[in-house]
């Protein structure tokens, strides 16, 4: 079977660390796999290291960096160019050319709506594997990313209507069936959520969703270990938050913590002390989480792995996606989100010294004690096999 895994939206290591384990398992099972990615710079060397063929996804015209704090799914698609019919058509036909060239039997989407539209036109079975944020629910109006989302309902209806209008213009040109609503981009797609229900970004997803759990394993991750036993052990993984990173490290220095900080794109760091080790590349969390006292992070993958190890989280949000995840963790009682009006030192002290946060994380870990990433990967592969055979 020829399988294309398409990554179109989002960035950084989280997508690659979720995609490559699935691709490797498929390839070892005798399938031909192709990885079409948004970011070749990150993905190509990592894919090559495990023998996976990697190419650039069809991006159409040049797209600027995704704005932060968008209000809804339609705004994401507009920002990525789907508000322009020419770009959308170029994107979809680009995917179709790949399908034909490589005789693709199944398309697997990692946050790749244009690839799913192309699969609809080509009548190729499709599977979506991703976080709750990346796989929207099948509802008439997709959820708002904002607190009090009812206030922007009319604007979201208008934006989604424009996206559907543009999509349908292209679908008509290419011989595809029209959409009635934006969620139908996923119509006929077998969806597998790389999370748990408690950590789904969507709080009111319709029943029947398939939760496989997280997959996060990056080849070439550096090994690290704790050096002390008499200090708080804190694991930090943050991107693009220069001022906040400085403040976090300053506070950690003040409490005498041992810190392993993964800061891939941080610039010059002002507050560094002897017990801080900084890494620009990914670090293997195995062996660190078991004896960590706190994790400071923003991404869904790192947060979920921390909670599976029973470690509470200080949540630092840089976008709506992070905010939605932070709210779920706070509802669970396993962490605190640092917001503009908060003092980092107070929030950190609260999580470290109030046992209720660790208790909530430990309870979550106990509930999913039987979980393994191998099982999650097996679930995805089972769905891919069923999709290819035409089963529901």
What are these regions (language model features)?
Residues 125-208:
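Active-site-proximal region of nucleotide-activated glycan assembly enzymes
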Residues 183-185, 345-392:
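C-terminal amphipathic helix plus adjacent low-complexity
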């Amino acid at each position: 079977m020829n399988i294309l895994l398409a990554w179109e939206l989002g960035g950084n290591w989280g997508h690659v660390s979720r995609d490559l384990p699935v691709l490797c398992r498929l390839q070892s099972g005798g399938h031909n796999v192709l990885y079409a990615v948004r970011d070749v710079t990150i993905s190509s060397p990592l894919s090559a290291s495990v023998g996976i063929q990697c190419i650039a996804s069809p991006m159409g015209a040049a797209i600027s960096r995704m704005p932060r704090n968008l209000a809804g799914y339609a705004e994401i698609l507009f920002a990525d160019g789907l508000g322009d019919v020419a770009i959308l058509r170029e994107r979809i036909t680009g995917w179709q050319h790949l399908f034909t060239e490589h005789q693709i039997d199944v398309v697997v989407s990692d946050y790749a709506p244009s690839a799913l539209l192309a699969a609809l036109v080509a009548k190729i079975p499709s599977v979506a594997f991703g976080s709750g944020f990346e796989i929207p629910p099948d509802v008439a109006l997709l959820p708002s990313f904002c607190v009090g989302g009812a206030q922007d309902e009319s604007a979201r209806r208008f934006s989604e209507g424009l996206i559907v209008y543009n999509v349908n213009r292209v679908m008509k040109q290419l011989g595809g069936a029209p959409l009635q609503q934006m969620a139908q981009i996923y119509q006929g797609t077998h969806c597998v959520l790389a999370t748990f229900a408690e950590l789904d970004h969507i709080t009111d997803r319709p029943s029947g969703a398939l939760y496989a759990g997280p997959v996060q394993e990056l080849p070439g991750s550096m090994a690290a270990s704790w050096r002390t036993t008499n200090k708080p052990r804190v694991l930090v993984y943050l991107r693009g938050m220069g001022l906040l990173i400085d403040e976090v490290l300053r506070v950690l220095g003040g409490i005498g913590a041992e810190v392993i900080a993964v800061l891939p794109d941080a610039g010059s760091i002002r507050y560094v002390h002897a017990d801080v080790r900084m890494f620009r590349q990914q670090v293997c969390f195995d062996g660190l989480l078991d004896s960590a006292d706190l994790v400071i992070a923003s991404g869904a993958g790192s947060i979920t792995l921390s909670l599976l190890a029973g470690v509470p989280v200080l949540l630092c949000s840089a976008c709506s996606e992070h905010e939605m995840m932070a709210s779920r963790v706070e509802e669970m009682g396993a962490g605190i989100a640092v917001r503009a009006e908060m003092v980092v030192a107070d929030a950190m002290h609260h999580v470290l010294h109030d046992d209720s946060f660790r208790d909530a994380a430990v309870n979550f870990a106990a509930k999913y004690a039987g979980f393994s990433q191998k099982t999650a990967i097996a679930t995805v592969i089972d769905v891919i096999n069923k999709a290819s055979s035409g089963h529901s």
